[in-house]
Amino acid sequence: MAIAEGDRFKDKLTGQSFIVKKIMDRTIILEAEDTPNRFCLSDGIVELFFDRTENKKSVN
């Protein structure tokens, strides 16, 4: 699975939503949408503990 900046993921355990803020080499920085939580993880860990969710589309 290719992960890009702006992708959204949901934590499998808590259901909390995260957005991919930055990708540096193989490190992915996830930031929570509603709280100041931030994680720095590898792509394999993201796939293991998070489910991909739909990206919100802008409404014009």
Specify the residue positions occupied by each region the protein language model found.
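Basic/aromatic-rich interaction segments and small domains that mediate binding to polyanionic partners
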Residues: K10-L41
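Intrinsically disordered, low-complexity, charged/polar segments
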Residues: D34-N60
